[in-house]
């Protein structure tokens, strides 16, 4: 099911890039191979692909993912089951230096910090 969804989203991203639009994927690309697919789509459309990696301690990430979704309008699917969180984090492939990620400290996310990180 997830493969079909991401294949569909990749097709949409490809078409948007062909049409000269910008695309932002706000999701967890835990695997290098998935990020490589997006880089290829971008490259095929003469677009830039940039990985933004938000880093936090695993215990804080667990708390954010599994608690209090009802208090956040961005968490429309609710809390992630702890078992799903553990599966995802245990299989995580952080980006390598050759991917040139922009690394964001997830404990410092303020407007000023983000502007500084992205040079805005």
Residue map of PLM features:
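Amphipathic alpha-helical transducer elements in NTP-driven molecular machines
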Residues: 2-10, 55, 82-89
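Short catalytic-loop micro-motif centered on adjacent basic/acidic residues
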Residues: 23-27, 51, 103
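Conserved AAA+ ATPase "sensor/coupling" helix adjacent to the nucleotide-binding pocket
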Residues: 67-71
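Glycine-/small-residue-rich active-site loops that bind phosphorylated ligands and cofactors
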Residues: 30, 57, 109
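Short glycine-/polar-rich loops that comprise or flank the Walker A/P-loop
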Residues: 19, 45-50, 97-101
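Small-molecule kinase domains that catalyze NTP-dependent phosphoryl transfer to phosphate-bearing small molecules
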Residues: 72-115
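Conserved phosphate-donor/acceptor-positioning beta-strand/loop module used by diverse small-molecule
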Residues: 44-65
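Conserved nucleotide-sensing/catalytic segment adjacent to the nucleotide-binding pocket
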Residues: 1-45
